[in-house]
């Protein structure tokens, strides 16, 4: 494709120069009958003007070629783009169970069952140890990576399945059943 575009640009350049040369020449003559074709400058003898035109055309051709070359290189090859997009991780801290329940209820319509699982895991880890009241900031990125409670996946890696946590089983059902009724046994 690159050589085809280069050839096409060269053909356009050559045809443009050919038509420009074919323009009727105007000469500076003292006895000019038709003043429309009479000019005071003889363009053929002004070689520096032609040099500027050719240099400008070559710069234009080089610019067009480099843009096409960059476009061809920036396209991903077939099979390279098959990797899944990078994962995003959101950590949410909760102080009370009522906050957890209201957050699960509001986020479940957006994220579905994944919201319950993520929030249940976050709640299980937050109950392991309470933060001192004097500490208002979250740990830094490097410190969070060193904690053994989290599983970190690099971009492009598949995240391993997490084991179920007890809090996930304690959450109320999301169906239309009321919490006090049990499903009928068969």
From Swiss-Prot:
Transcription as UniProt keyword: no
Q: Which domain of life is it from?
A: Eukaryota
Q: What is this protein called?
A: Transmembrane protein 52B
Q: Kindly state one GO CC term assigned in the UniProt record.
A: membrane
Signal peptide coordinates: 1-28
- Annotated transmembrane regions: 44-64
Q: How does it sit in the membrane?
A: Single-pass type I membrane protein
Using the UniProt annotation, give all residue ranges assigned to the region (Disordered): 158-186
Q: Where in the cell is it found?
A: Membrane
Q: Coding gene?
A: Tmem52b
Per UniProt, the keywords (alphabetical) are: Membrane, Signal, Transmembrane, Transmembrane helix
Q: Which Pfam families match?
A: TMEM52
